Amino acid sequence: MPRTRTPLAAIVLAAGKGTRMKSNKAKVLHEVAGRPLAYYPVKRALELGASPVVVVVGHQAEAVEAALSAALPEAPLRFAVQEQQLGTAHAVLAAKRALRGYRGPVLILSGDTPLLRAETLEAVVSAGRRARAAVSLATMTLEVPRGYGRVVRDARGRPARIVEEKDATEAERAVREVNAGLYCVDAELLWKKLAKVGTANAQREFYLTDLVPMAAQAGGVAGVEVPAEEASGVNDRVELSRANRVMVGRLAEAFMRAGVTIEDPARFDCDEGVEIGADAVIEPNVRLRGRTRVGARTRVGVGAVITDGVLADGVTVNPYTVISEAQVAEGAILGPFSRLRPGADIGPEAHVGNFVEVKKSRLGKGAKANHLAYLGDAEIGAGANIGAGTITCNYDGERKNPTRIGEGAFIGSDSILVAPIEIGAGAYVAAGSTLTDPVPAGALALGRARQVTKEGWVAQRQAEKQMKGTATGPASARKGRPAARRAS
């Protein structure tokens, strides 16, 4: 989306509590595709070239400010506080100081409209310029317009006023064209007219919509109809879920058009900001979170969950693998049912198999841990083999200790490596060993008790049991009385 070449500022209204969410968290902090609701209108305004963007905060102001600053650290954001939520006009007035000295159009958006596209904002801004109107506003047509302010047009078909539902007559309530809550207003007119807005309405609030009849007299109002899906706000958990599904659907479509195979878009879930390379294949029920990057030709299997993971080209992620803050090099094979925890670094062509957990450890090229192992705080050399059931005992109750396994080393099944410990290159560790001392390169280490085999033990034990049973038989039998016979 090309940025506008003329000055443009924006105000995003994000002060409300959102009581219908029934949450202790401010409404605009609830997430769609991994981002706070307010992130999206702010980002769209930035994409259009708005600078500055003033976010009006109120309920949980510090949390909202922190979330947006973290999500958009380089953006020209300013924050204004609306101490009391007295209406939309009052909220816009709270931004006046932050825009002191600015002259030009001001885009005003609601913080709970995540589905707005930058093209839609551009249409609203451009409509005002083309019509030389003091105000341009977005409208939408709804089959059931309950809860929205109705747009009343004049004889020439231009927006003349907006009537909130609680103040509307029966005839006005029948109107299906409603206010979308998106405006572009000249800054000078905005501050001048807002000072005249009163509270003569059913809610006793300062309505921003009162600006429309004032602007109609001052220089006209341009109306732009926009898709209802984009402009509808999120007010409860049902609408939040719908918005999330639409946003994820848009992301899936963009990936597919860029050469990614998503086998079932309806069962695909990802966050805004995820990257996927061409010819990657994403199987059903995969979840990609945070800043995850999936390389070209990588295949992610059913049920995998990846959060802030970096996967190179040609990686195979088998079903139900969980990856968090880890990186995987080209050609590596993971899973099924493997877990990479923060700090895991899997080298090229390495294998991490089923029920293997890796934390803060690096596997070199071609290293393999194919089954049932825990590798924590470990450095594993290229070509090393980690047998099933191997554990690095990295925690001594006070600190984490490292394990180093050299290139080409072979660790037998069910081995316990008590850190800190180092296994040299090419060394062998016998299955079932518990090791506490270093193993030199090329050596064989055995850390288990010697096997003892007792031939004939089973027969001897059975004979002893039989003799014991005879010695402890019924008292009558021991006294020489005839034993009772069973009828045949």
From Swiss-Prot:
Annotated cofactor note: Binds 1 Mg(2+) ion per subunit.
Cofactor(s) named in the record: Mg(2+)
Predominant subcellular localization, coarse grouping: cytoplasm
Residue numbers annotated as active site: 371
UniProt-annotated stretches for the region Linker: 238-258
GO molecular function: glucosamine-1-phosphate N-acetyltransferase activity; magnesium ion binding; UDP-N-acetylglucosamine diphosphorylase activity
CDD domains linked: GT2_GlmU_N_bac, LbH_GlmU_C
Residues the entry annotates as binding UDP-N-acetyl-alpha-D-glucosamine: 13-16, 27, 82, 87-88, 110-112, 149, 164, 179, 235, 341, 359, 374, 385
Pathway membership, UniProt: Nucleotide-sugar biosynthesis; UDP-N-acetyl-alpha-D-glucosamine biosynthesis; N-acetyl-alpha-D-glucosamine 1-phosphate from alpha-D-glucosamine 6-phosphate (route II): step 2/2; Nucleotide-sugar biosynthesis; UDP-N-acetyl-alpha-D-glucosamine biosynthesis; UDP-N-acetyl-alpha-D-glucosamine from N-acetyl-alpha-D-glucosamine 1-phosphate: step 1/1; Bacterial outer membrane biogenesis; LPS lipid A biosynthesis
Entry's Gene Ontology cellular component terms: cytoplasm; membrane
E.C. designation(s): 2.7.7.23, 2.3.1.157
Subcellular location: Cytoplasm
Basic residues: compositionally biased ranges: 478-488
Residues annotated to bind acetyl-CoA: 388, 394-395, 413, 431, 448
Region feature Pyrophosphorylase, mapped onto this chain: 1-237
Sequence positions that bind Mg(2+): 112, 235
Pfam families: Hexapep, NTP_transf_3
Known partners and oligomeric status: Homotrimer.
Its job: Catalyzes the last two sequential reactions in the de novo biosynthetic pathway for UDP-N-acetylglucosamine (UDP-GlcNAc). The C-terminal domain catalyzes the transfer of acetyl group from acetyl coenzyme A to glucosamine-1-phosphate (GlcN-1-P) to produce N-acetylglucosamine-1-phosphate (GlcNAc-1-P), which is converted into UDP-GlcNAc by the transfer of uridine 5-monophosphate (from uridine 5-triphosphate), a reaction catalyzed by the N-terminal domain.
Family classification: In the N-terminal section; belongs to the N-acetylglucosamine-1-phosphate uridyltransferase family.
Protein name (Swiss-Prot/TrEMBL): Bifunctional protein GlmU
Species for this entry: Anaeromyxobacter dehalogenans (strain 2CP-1 / ATCC BAA-258)
